């Protein structure tokens, strides 16, 4: 059986290592699912996700000249397309942004002055 990049196949886990899992494909060939291609989240221990003998669906991601087959479990899963968000907000004009910035900076500056003056004990007067 010819194995083509991009095809989805059913396979059986035949071996697990610390860097991935070996999968026997239809036709007797074996490919490797790298640990980074097992799940969408971080996989610290592959044994938490796979066991020898498990049936898995894999996607062929590469076939090298020396016959090595790279597989992915996470790319074989059909994920629903993310819908584009419809966050339409009218753009603020430059003047609106500038007015908002000036108001915010005035508020911050006045509160900073208030806090500084209260720590000094009033309008800069020193205590005797």
From Swiss-Prot:
Residue ranges constituting the S1 motif domain according to the UniProt record: 6-74
Disordered: region residues: 72-128
Pfam (any one): S1
Extent of Basic and acidic residues compositional bias: 78-120
CDD domains, per database record: S1_RPS1_repeat_hs4
Superkingdom of origin organism: Bacteria
PROSITE patterns to which the protein is assigned, alphabetical: S1
SUPFAM superfamilies: Nucleic acid-binding proteins
GO molecular function per UniProt: nucleic acid binding
Family membership noted in the UniProt record: Belongs to the peptidase U57 family.
Protein name according to UniProt: Uncharacterized protein YabR
Taxonomic source organism: Bacillus subtilis (strain 168)
Taxonomic lineage: Bacteria, Bacillati, Bacillota, Bacilli, Bacillales
